[in-house]
């Protein structure tokens, strides 16, 4: 009987959260329904550093400092705009040359961050690119908001459109040489965008784009990985050391801070409707954090290795791990299931009816019951980002391409 209390503690830990029992074994990933090619492939002008579905809209942050909104047009609009899109694409090349030159000079002239303020002011907004950002974003939008699908494969120019939201000026590396200001995370609330990017000497910075201008903030600590809007005046920052920081935009100061674990941060997801922040770590644990109450609700030990990606939608959750035997975990409120992908699962995604996770040579799509219904084959690409958009599954690696797989 002396072993009973530890066993009870273990049982409580396993069933923590929503009461779904965690299975002990994993199922295979084979399925006969295969998709061999993407329906569309969008080629961008730089590598994709982050790809997200924000309030039903697709956004891609690139390693050249540009943020694009990606739109999947209807068949009717595609047919109507095809000729116009092609003509615009023909004019785009010549226009971009002069516009990009002017934009680069204008941005660089006004993008310097004021480092002469005291330490308190350094936490607040460092600089605001009010007029230059608005003007340059407008100029570049006119040249870059094309409906051209720039891939040689499966090219349908008027089906996919991209809209430039803003473009950051170049940063400088340790040798004072110009480099792209990589945008590596982004969130949106209303018409405000919060994003993380690499500034000079690879210093990570926070930016907020609203009303045609960008306000830059010094981050309160190094190693910030993710940003989420809590409200219009507050963002939640997640650190590599599994820190949660509430950052007040008006004062530039941290209003709340909590460290979840000593393990490094893995993937994260925020269900704004429920106020639940899902955070994972290298120890294979996921944490359910109540963003409104600012307290930890529960945690689950799911994998034996680090977790790369998580997704949360209502009572459904997925996690992708480096655990070779239990690579992917899925629960739908009634039951849970592990999948053995025989490879690290770098990305997972959920829609109201489906789920998806990467495998070594492609992607698997599951229904709400956890049954694999589609198998997407890839050549040599590694997919780091997955999301659902209408009847498409959308994915990208750290390259110039965004893939659109039709699911109907």
Task: Please name every model-derived segment.
Residues 19-47:
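A short helix->beta-strand "capping" segment at the edge of beta-propeller domains
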Residues 37-42, 163-177, 212-219, 253-259, ...:
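A short beta-strand motif characteristic of beta-propeller blades
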Residues 51, 184-186, 227, 268, ...:
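Hydrophobic core register within WD40 beta-propeller blades
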Residues 379-408:
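Blade-level signature of beta-propeller repeat domains, shared across WD40, Kelch, NHL, RCC1
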Residues 66-71, 201-207, 243-246, 285-288, ...:
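Structural motif
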Residues 55-56, 191, 232-234, 273-275, ...:
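Short coil/turn segments that connect the beta-strands within blades of beta-propeller domains
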Residues 62-63, 199-200, 239-240, 280-283, ...:
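Conserved strand-to-loop turn within each blade of WD40 beta-propeller repeats
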Residues 72-73, 209-212, 248-252, 290-294, ...:
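Short loop/turn segments that connect beta-strands within beta-propeller blades
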